[in-house]
């Protein structure tokens, strides 16, 4: 293969990773782990991350004294917003026995206010914004602009990985908002045990609860982020908009209320149409 072909392939990978617009294809890819992606029993890939304070985090620095929970996140990810409160609670519970790291990866829903970072300086700026916005007390770091570690694992927007102190993956969760599954895994790892469950791929609960954060987070990204979600993920955009009608409720409850409202409306509409057809 010629050097020109290799360079073109590298450029294509970069463009796909640092996408400018959210698409339906990306939405469906985010709903499950890729076949063959790193999981329980695998060694964590090599990495060299930069923390928001400028420190470099490598395998030898991160692993050694205690288990490590690493979570993906970004400023325009509703799942990150939904997971933040439960992660803060888990940190209060396990932070003295498990090392927590938030990895800023790439913007889930890029827009005018938060475009995809094109330089390491910009990526670190976004990582600092993430740490400040959610008042994260543990280490927040950034992958490089091409997302080498993110892609080596499985480039999901808000998954979580729990490792032994030697870097062996014990558990992974598709969504960091799956608080109960992550707590059980943390409890086992903190006690030196292997978690009974090696992964969580729960979809309905975490995603439904996150609907209460969708509109707020899309607006944070900018008008483009809002438009792209309506185009690429209409049901999610609609649920997020309906959730704003339940503002007195907590974000989790707003998401549940929105989905129940839409489901009830759909059933009623089907019933009315059925009755009309039968007349």
How should these model regions be labeled?
Residues 56-88, 99-104:
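Short active-site neighborhood of thiol/selenol oxidoreductases, capturing the structured segment around
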